[in-house]
Amino acid sequence: MKIIRARTAGFCMGVSLALRKLDREVTENNAPIATLGPIIHNPQVMAHYEERGVRCLRDTAQVVPGQRVVIRAHGIPVAEETALKATGASVVDATCPKVKRAQLGIAEERGRGGTLLLFGEADHPEVRGLLSYAGEGAMVFGSLDELKGLPLRDDVAYFLAAQTTQDRAGFEDVVSWLRQRLGHDIPVLQTICDATRKRQQEAVDIARRVQAMVVVGGFDSGNTRRLADVARAQGVFTVHVETVDQLPVDELRKKSVIGLTAGASTPKSLIDAVQRFLESL
């Protein structure tokens, strides 16, 4: 069996940076360490840090005196960050720089009187954080069809942004439709991470050359789910797994060429394990 592994598979810059900050806290501090929410969307990574004594807090009410709290890579809402600092905890901001740039860009456009239209998953922590910088009137949509159902007004000065891990092609479709619907251009913040674009494009390129695609990453990871979506859209059998034991072995044994990629929060060890198993079939 031939395996074509994506060169872009695995940790992105933002994830690597966040985990380096957390590793430094664990190594250099005697104080109790916690993250506010999962630092990244990968349960195996979270289990690794839990074994090292890192707590994952649901909210700021769980902060204890003397604790050092690391803000997740996805960022947090403004009100939550204010509440966290008010606890007196030592705060370490591990927000991805690309997410931070999106937050500040949205705040700047809001300051000019703009109303945000956000292309993203409404229940995703990054999106909740981005919306908190947008003020009243902001609307979020997960697809072009959802956007078409929103009550857009001709007398409102909209601007557009996207979750950093959103689908680039879908975003371009949104821009085109809004131009037609509103009859003019609106400010468009280029908030989709370039690493996301490259990862998705490589997944598409590989999917067109193989008989099956395996995508490795957390089921809660939006960028991993979208990798599976763009691969599946090429008409190839695609499976999204977190670990090697979830692979549909009987189905994959029928294939001679399999593509392998992984989300931005998937550790190399998990990708390697899946590749070794596939090569053994």
Swiss-Prot record:
Tell me its cofactors: [4Fe-4S] cluster
Top-tier EC class: oxidoreductase
Q: Give the record's cofactor note, including how many are bound.
A: Binds 1 [4Fe-4S] cluster per subunit.
Which BP terms in the Gene Ontology apply to this protein?
dimethylallyl diphosphate biosynthetic process; isopentenyl diphosphate biosynthetic process, methylerythritol 4-phosphate pathway; terpenoid biosynthetic process
Read off the Pfam families from this record.
LYTB (PF02401)
List residues binding [4Fe-4S] cluster. 12, 96, 193
The UniProt record gives the binding positions of isopentenyl diphosphate as 41, 74, 124, 221, 223, 265
**UniProt GO molecular function:** 4 iron, 4 sulfur cluster binding; 4-hydroxy-3-methylbut-2-enyl diphosphate reductase activity; metal ion binding
Q: Where is the active site?
A: 126 (proton donor)
What UniProt keywords apply to this chain's record, in alphabetical order? 4Fe-4S, Iron, Iron-sulfur, Isoprene biosynthesis, Metal-binding, Oxidoreductase
Task: Give the pathway.
Answer: Isoprenoid biosynthesis; dimethylallyl diphosphate biosynthesis; dimethylallyl diphosphate from (2E)-4-hydroxy-3-methylbutenyl diphosphate: step 1/1; Isoprenoid biosynthesis; isopentenyl diphosphate biosynthesis via DXP pathway; isopentenyl diphosphate from 1-deoxy-D-xylulose 5-phosphate: step 6/6
Report the catalytic activity: isopentenyl diphosphate + 2 oxidized [2Fe-2S]-[ferredoxin] + H2O = (2E)-4-hydroxy-3-methylbut-2-enyl diphosphate + 2 reduced [2Fe-2S]-[ferredoxin] + 2 H(+); dimethylallyl diphosphate + 2 oxidized [2Fe-2S]-[ferredoxin] + H2O = (2E)-4-hydroxy-3-methylbut-2-enyl diphosphate + 2 reduced [2Fe-2S]-[ferredoxin] + 2 H(+)
- The EC number(s) this enzyme carries: 1.17.7.4
Specify which residues bind (2E)-4-hydroxy-3-methylbut-2-enyl diphosphate according to the UniProt entry for this protein: 41, 74, 124, 164, 221, 223, 265
Q: Which residues bind dimethylallyl diphosphate?
A: 41, 74, 124, 221, 223, 265
PANTHER family to which the protein is assigned, alphabetical: 4-HYDROXY-3-METHYLBUT-2-ENYL DIPHOSPHATE REDUCTASE (PTHR30426:SF0)
Q: What does this protein do?
A: Catalyzes the conversion of 1-hydroxy-2-methyl-2-(E)-butenyl 4-diphosphate (HMBPP) into a mixture of isopentenyl diphosphate (IPP) and dimethylallyl diphosphate (DMAPP). Acts in the terminal step of the DOXP/MEP pathway for isoprenoid precursor biosynthesis.
Q: Which family does it belong to?
A: Belongs to the IspH family.
Protein name in the entry: 4-hydroxy-3-methylbut-2-enyl diphosphate reductase
Q: Which organism is it from?
A: Nitratidesulfovibrio vulgaris (strain DSM 19637 / Miyazaki F)
Question: Which lineage ranks, top first, belong to the organism behind this chain?
Answer: Bacteria, Pseudomonadati, Thermodesulfobacteriota, Desulfovibrionia, Desulfovibrionales
Q: Which gene encodes it?
A: ispH
